[in-house]
UniProtKB/Swiss-Prot annotation:
SUPFAM superfamilies: all-alpha NTP pyrophosphatases
Known pathway: Amino-acid biosynthesis; L-histidine biosynthesis; L-histidine from 5-phospho-alpha-D-ribose 1-diphosphate: step 2/9
Compartments in which it is found: Cytoplasm
Family: Belongs to the PRA-PH family.
Predominant place of localization: cytoplasm
Record-given protein name: Phosphoribosyl-ATP pyrophosphatase
Keywords: Amino-acid biosynthesis, ATP-binding, Cytoplasm, Histidine biosynthesis, Hydrolase, Nucleotide-binding
Swiss-Prot/TrEMBL GO biological process terms: L-histidine biosynthetic process
EC number: 3.6.1.31
A GO MF term: ATP binding
Signal peptide: none
Native species: Hydrogenovibrio crunogenus (strain DSM 25203 / XCL-2) (Thiomicrospira crunogena)
Listed HAMAP family: HisE
Length: 113
């Protein structure tokens, strides 16, 4: 997925904040608030885990890709609701690029102390 599609989604999700919850699924989630959005992210995460297990057994990743797309989409809704965007995440990933996972975790632990 190119970053362009993420930026396009950011704009659309931001625009949905002013749309009617009766006509926009995303607007309805915003209206219901953080707990509803978190519930959807949790549901999508669970469905992603189940799809990954199924994919390992069936050797077919189609449903896994579908579920990860749902998870990403709902995570983008969460970010937008919190006043963040995909750019915040890609910037964080860029900061971590080139670090080993162990090094990144050690740096995180130092910052949390």
């Amino acid at each position: 997925m190119s970053n362009d599609i993420l930026l396009q989604l950011d704009k659309i999700l931001d625009a949905r904040k002013t749309e009617s919850p009766e006509t926009s699924y995303v607007a309805s989630l915003y209206e219901k608030g953080l707990d509803k959005i978190l519930k959807k992210v949790g549901e999508e995460a669970t469905e992603t885990v189940m799809a990954a297990k199924d994919a390992e057994y069936t050797q077919n990743n189609d449903n896994l890709v579908y579920e990860v797309a749902d998870l990403w989409f709902h995570t983008l809704i969460l970010l937008s609701h919190q006043g963040l965007s995909s750019t915040d995440i890609t910037n964080e990933l860029q900061k971590r690029f080139g670090l080993s996972g162990h090094e990144e975790k050690a740096n995180r632990s130092k910052n949390d102390a």
